[in-house]
Amino acid sequence: MKKPEREHLRKVAELGCIACAKLGYHDTPAEIHHITSGAMGKKSDNYSVIPLCPYHHRTSNESYHLSPLWFTEKFGTQTELLKETLEWLK
């Protein structure tokens, strides 16, 4: 991974969880979620990422990885969340 990619991932993680922010909880520590694309669910590149806390990313029944349909209905599509994330970085 090149330095610009690492820097981008760091900045995204520093934003805090985008799902928590939509619920009114700001500055929740986040990890990186690579948005998936295509029928095979391939991970995207290191610039197509959104910040999610472990709860919303992978550990709860409300997480993207365990309940993607529920998560999408509640918070929006991965593409919509990516667009918001990129706006936050401006």
What are these regions (language model features)?
Residues 2-31:
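Short cysteine-rich loop/turn motifs with clustered Cys
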Residues 12, 34, 53:
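Divalent metal-coordination and catalytic microenvironments
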Residues 21, 54-57:
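Cys/His-coordinated zinc-binding microdomains
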Residues 22, 35, 40-42:
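The feature represents the first ordered module of a protein
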Residues 27-35, 61-66:
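Short Cys/His-rich "knuckle" micro-motifs
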Residues 28, 48-49:
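Conserved catalytic motifs of the protein kinase core domain
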Residues 39-48, 58-90:
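Polybasic, low-complexity binding patches
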